[in-house]
């Protein structure tokens, strides 16, 4: 029998601490990222049982979900938000956990902060009480979201019971055409697999179109692995990964880095390893993507008509499409370019890094936001914000009529003051278009940063390729 392993199996096997017969294996956890929303009860549990945080040096906290993006005032997002942030401060102080709070230069969205500081490294197991923890899989680490009781377990033991998942390979063959981004690639993938196609699997993304991506692009792809139902998404580390890691705050240095890279280079799927499922896409066929429905799998290319419910053979999908069109206020057969947007949001753990901000700024430069549109640019961290301002991108946005905000999760989820009103339509670079996700009865369309910025200027959805062709 072959001993060949997939990347996921290599990382998983390297972290099995206890594997008792008939029991779910216990994995050692290398990094635990913490935020204000899913941690209060976990710390309470430690207190009740008289336990400490087992590995404070491997635990990092920040405030992101309900922070205001207009002020550093802790009271700005309401009573619940204030209590959660104050509680996180007290808990981190009491238990000795590193916290990047509202006024810290490293504060930011947890999945932006980890990689940019070198906290995230290849071959690690990484958990966080947040479903988009898969983002860190871009480094060839096994990263996934956990619930609050599991947060407590990891704080107390630095381990977690975790069953072995099935494996899926998603290969994006060839090169993408001009103007196609990581967001378009991952939305096209989810359009093919559906929002449940990856359930029960850990996915490895590969192929030329994936390895061509920068680390920030790879993070966008892995961030949305959860949106096809997968437990986690990984990309094998390579020279692009090692270059990104080098010189960051918590990255290994000197001989330690050389030794680490030698090990990290072994973190790839063996040639004769078998996957439980394989999905492939032709990169050259991927066009700019826009979601039309209420899950990320309900997505089309910008030049395709909105699908009719009767075009779906699966009765469940048909009913889902009918409900989605009614909720979204869309008519089958029409083009998404026929619909005006009310708000535009560039941000979230999917698309708030410096390359995303640059892409939006390139479209915004010399243009003006349509009169009826409110457009928000929300950098993913203080570090991203500082870099963007150093490059003068904030000036470009302000001159074009965009709002330049402070870092946070912002309009991705209605847990702070940035939200949609009923029936407001939003072009959003976030990762979820569920009913009410951005505000009660709000209508979310997921797009790339360039597509979002273009919609802000036109006042409706446009094909970014028509703009870049003119330029």
Curated annotation (Swiss-Prot):
The UniProt record lists the keyword Lyase: yes
4Fe-4S is among the record's keywords: yes
Pathway membership: Amino-acid biosynthesis; L-leucine biosynthesis; L-leucine from 3-methyl-2-oxobutanoate: step 2/4
Biological processes per GO annotation: L-leucine biosynthetic process
Cofactor: [4Fe-4S] cluster
Enzyme class: lyase
Stored InterPro entries: 3-IsopropMal_deHydase_lsu (IPR004430), Acnase/IPM_dHydase_lsu_aba_1/3 (IPR015931), Acoase/IPM_deHydtase_lsu_aba (IPR001030), Aconitase_4Fe-4S_BS (IPR018136), Aconitase_4Fe-4S_dom (IPR036008), IPM_dehydratase_rel_enz (IPR050067), IPMI_cat (IPR033941)
Residues holding [4Fe-4S] cluster: 349, 409, 412
Summary of the function given for this chain in its UniProt record: Catalyzes the isomerization between 2-isopropylmalate and 3-isopropylmalate, via the formation of 2-isopropylmaleate.
UniProt name for this protein: 3-isopropylmalate dehydratase large subunit
Organism, scientific name: Aliivibrio salmonicida (strain LFI1238) (Vibrio salmonicida (strain LFI1238))
Gene expressing this chain: leuC
């Amino acid at each position: 029998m072959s001993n060949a392993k997939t990347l996921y199996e290599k990382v998983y096997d390297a972290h099995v601490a206890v594997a008792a017969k008939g029991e779910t294996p216990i994995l050692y956890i290398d990094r635990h990222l913490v935020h204000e929303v899913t941690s209060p009860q976990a710390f309470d549990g430690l207190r009740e049982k008289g336990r400490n945080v087992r590995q404070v040096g491997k635990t990092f906290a920040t405030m992101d979900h309900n922070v205001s993006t207009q002020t550093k005032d802790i009271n700005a997002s309401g009573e619940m938000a204030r209590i959660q942030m104050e509680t996180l401060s007290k808990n981190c102080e009491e238990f000795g956990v590193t916290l990047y709070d509202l006024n810290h230069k490293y504060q930011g969205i947890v999945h932006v902060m980890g990689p940019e500081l070198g906290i995230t490294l290849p071959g690690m197991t990484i958990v966080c009480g947040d479903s988009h923890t898969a983002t860190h899989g871009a480094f060839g680490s096994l990263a996934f979201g956990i619930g609050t009781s599991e947060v407590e377990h990891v704080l107390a033991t630095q381990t977690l019971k975790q069953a072995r998942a099935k494996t899926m390979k998603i290969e994006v063959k060839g090169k993408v055409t001009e103007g196609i981004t990581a967001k378009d690639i991952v939305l096209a993938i989810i359009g093919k697999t559906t929002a449940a196609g990856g359930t029960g699997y850990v996915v490895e993304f590969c192929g030329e179109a994936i390895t061509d991506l920068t680390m920030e692009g790879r993070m966008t792809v892995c961030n949305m692995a959860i949106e096809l139902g997968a437990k986690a998404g990984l990309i094998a580390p390579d020279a692009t990964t090692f270059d990104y890691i080098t010189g960051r705050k918590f990255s290994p240095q000197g001989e330690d880095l050389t030794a680490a890279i030698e090990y990290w280079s072994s973190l790839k799927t063996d040639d004769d390893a078998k996957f439980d499922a394989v999905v492939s896409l032709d990169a050259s066929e991927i066009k700019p993507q826009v979601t039309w429905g209420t899950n990320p799998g309900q997505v089309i290319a910008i030049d395709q008509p909105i699908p009719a419910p009767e075009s779906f053979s699966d009765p469940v999908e048909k009913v889902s499409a009918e409900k989605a069109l009614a909720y979204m206020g869309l008519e089958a057969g029409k083009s998404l370019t026929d619909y005006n947007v009310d708000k535009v949001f560039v941000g979230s753990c999917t698309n708030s890094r410096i390359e995303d901000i640059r892409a939006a700024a390139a479209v915004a430069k010399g243009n003006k936001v349509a009169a009826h549109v409110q457009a928000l640019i929300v950098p993913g961290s203080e570090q991203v914000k500082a870099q963007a301002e150093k490059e003068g991108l904030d000036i470009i946005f302000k001159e074009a009529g965009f709002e330049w905000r402070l870092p946070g999760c912002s309009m991705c989820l209605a847990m702070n003051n940035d939200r949609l009103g009923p029936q407001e339509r939003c072009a959003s670079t976030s990762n979820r278009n569920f009913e009410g996700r951005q505000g009660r009865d709000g209508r979310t369309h997921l797009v790339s940063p360039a597509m979002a910025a273009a919609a802000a200027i036109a006042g409706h959805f446009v094909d970014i390729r028509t703009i870049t062709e003119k330029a």
